[in-house]
């Protein structure tokens, strides 16, 4: 609806005043801002998860939470996101609150450890201040905080072992996210919080599992991913990796409740070749006949492991298949089973600010 000349003039004056007072771009028409508001992403290193996220990766300028049980692949997934950001020419930082960063394994996941920024803070406030400084620098593309459970408030560290300080960590997270959210959006950085699970005592109905750090992170996160190990992969008696399932339990940039499965191998992290095979078969780009895998009429190998090895030995072919998968999936997203409502972590019963 067209505005009258008087209203148009008054609106232009108001917008001009806001821009002068708060800076250019403080207010704008959506049509003018469409190019700035387009969702930019960083791939996750798993094409199945990129498809499940609906936009091809984790969105820039947003908070992302990855949670799950111990040894489920949280850090591995975060390191693959770091590796993808570095491949795109970006800078990544890893805030190691758990003091357990393994540079050898990170290198296997594709991380350029020589150019990775690593910090091992002494307490929670220091970790979050470092995170804020990096975000406000506008020079970093990914910041990973490992983990929320290890962000121990300074008062708790300086107190006695038996002191009860309920809600202290939740208040710390709530305050930090209030300060960080605007800066994260403006800087286009992805801030990834890794989180652990805890069990609530006395729960009779629903899931007894919950995450640490209060309620704030659940609200501020645009994407929340629940990662679980569902199967152990073996070569004879030797364990060589695990089959992992990720459920996107919250997604503000695409439909939620999709899920993805992929292999995490001990010697390489997320298996790219295995991922390409699985998704390629699901999309009918790769044909499976008996034990054989085919691309068109060309054989890729007999058995999944042989086909994976063939793709690893022919990276140009793997790149071409991945390009076909992305073109097909992004044009018409594949149907990925939604998780049941009771699979989502229940938020009730936590101290929060």
From Swiss-Prot:
Q: What InterPro entries does this protein map onto?
A: AAA+_ATPase (IPR003593), DNA_recomb/repair_RecA (IPR013765), DNA_recomb/repair_RecA_CS (IPR020584), P-loop_NTPase (IPR027417), RecA-like_C (IPR049261), RecA-like_N (IPR049428), RecA_ATP-bd (IPR020588), RecA_C_sf (IPR023400)
Q: Name one GO biological process term.
A: DNA repair
Q: Could you tell me which Pfam families the record lists for this protein?
A: RecA (PF00154), RecA_C (PF21096)
GO CC annotation terms, alphabetical = cytosol
Localization terms from the record? Cytoplasm
Give residues annotated as binding ATP.
68-75
List the Gene Ontology MF annotations in alphabetical order: ATP binding; ATP hydrolysis activity; ATP-dependent DNA damage sensor activity; damaged DNA binding; single-stranded DNA binding
Q: What is its main location?
A: cytoplasm
Q: In which family does this protein belong, per the annotation?
A: Belongs to the RecA family.
Q: Which UniProt keywords apply?
A: ATP-binding, Cytoplasm, DNA damage, DNA recombination, DNA repair, DNA-binding, Nucleotide-binding, SOS response
Keyword Transmembrane included in the entry's annotation = no
Source organism per entry reads Roseiflexus castenholzii (strain DSM 13941 / HLO8)
Name assigned to this protein:
Protein RecA
Function description: Can catalyze the hydrolysis of ATP in the presence of single-stranded DNA, the ATP-dependent uptake of single-stranded DNA by duplex DNA, and the ATP-dependent hybridization of homologous single-stranded DNAs. It interacts with LexA causing its activation and leading to its autocatalytic cleavage.
């Amino acid at each position: 609806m067209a505005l009258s000349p008087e209203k148009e003039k008054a609106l232009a004056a108001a917008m001009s005043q806001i821009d002068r007072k708060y800076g250019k771009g403080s207010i704008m028409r959506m049509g003018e801002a469409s190019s700035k508001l387009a969702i930019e992403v960083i791939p996750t290193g798993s094409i199945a998860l990129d498809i499940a996220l609906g936009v091809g990766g984790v969105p820039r300028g947003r908070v992302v939470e990855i949670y799950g049980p111990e040894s489920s692949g949280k850090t591995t997934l975060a390191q693959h996101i770091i590796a993808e950001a570095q491949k795109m020419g970006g800078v990544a930082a890893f805030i190691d609150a758990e003091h357990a960063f393994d540079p050898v394994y990170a290198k296997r996941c594709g991380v350029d450890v020589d150019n990775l920024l690593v910090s091992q803070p002494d307490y929670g406030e220091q970790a979050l201040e470092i995170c804020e400084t990096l975000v406000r620098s506008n020079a970093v593309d990914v910041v990973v905080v490992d983990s929320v459970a290890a962000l121990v408030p300074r008062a708790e560290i300086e107190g006695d072992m038996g002191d009860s300080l309920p809600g202290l960590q939740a208040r710390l997270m709530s305050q930090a996210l209030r300060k960080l959210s605007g800066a994260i959006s403006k800087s286009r950085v992805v801030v990834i919080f890794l989180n652990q699970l805890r069990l609530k005592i006395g729960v009779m109905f629903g899931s007894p599992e919950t995450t640490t750090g209060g309620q704030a992170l659940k609200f501020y996160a645009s994407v929340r991913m629940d990662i679980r190990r569902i199967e152990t992969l073996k070569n004879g008696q030797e364990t060589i990796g695990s089959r992992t399932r990720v459920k996107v339990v919250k997604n503000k940039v695409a439909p939620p409740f999709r899920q993805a499965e992929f292999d995490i191998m001990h010697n390489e992290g997320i298996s790219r070749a295995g991922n390409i095979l699985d998704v390629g078969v699901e999309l009918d780009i790769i044909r499976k006949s008996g034990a054989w895998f085919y691309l068109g009429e060309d054989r890729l190998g007999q058995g999944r492991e042989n086909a994976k090895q063939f793709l690893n030995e022919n990276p140009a072919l793997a790149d071409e298949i991945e390009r076909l998968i992305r073109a097909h999936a992004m044009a018409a997203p594949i149907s990925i089973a939604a998780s049941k409502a009771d699979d989502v972590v229940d938020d009730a019963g936590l101290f929060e600010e």
